[in-house]
């Protein structure tokens, strides 16, 4: 941490970031300072209806508004089951830098390439899935509800062969 002007105290110069970056090495990432009225974005969308326009027919999706609020940097969806689970997703991976889920209700089961055991994420638990990791959703409860957060909001999904389950990458 850079020394403060008075090294005998814990004072931080007004121009310095409290974590030690004086702002001289890196330009700020955002235009600021701003008034709250210029920057506040309402991301809660309780009135937003669920839609059945996602990749799976057995769940419905509700956009939480994060993509619009973050210029596409982050996407968030409320996802819930509407029919019994009828088929695994098949092995695939997503082109994203962050993929997080938080299960509100029920449970979800994954298989991961190179991992022998099924990974279960139950209500009150979360999962951070590293970028590019091949996986297969192999089960879920009929009452599943979760929040999914992705970075970026828009991303590609690629199917991969069964050989991935054995750790063979093409």
Predicted features, each with a name:
Residues 2-83, 157-170:
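A short, N-terminal "cap"/entry segment at the start of jelly-roll beta-barrel domains
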Residues 57, 93-94, 120, 130:
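Short solvent-exposed loop/turn micro-motifs enriched in small/polar/acidic residues
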Residues 67-74, 84-100, 114-116, 142:
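A short beta-loop-beta micro-motif enriched in histidine and acidic residues
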Residues 78-81, 93-112, 149-152:
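Short, conserved beta-strand element in jelly-roll/cupin
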Residues 114-132:
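Short acidic-glycine-tyrosine-enriched beta hairpin
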Residues 116-118, 142-144, 161-164:
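Short, glycine/charged-enriched secondary-structure capping and boundary segments
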Residues 122, 131-156:
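Ligand-binding loop in jelly-roll beta-barrel domains
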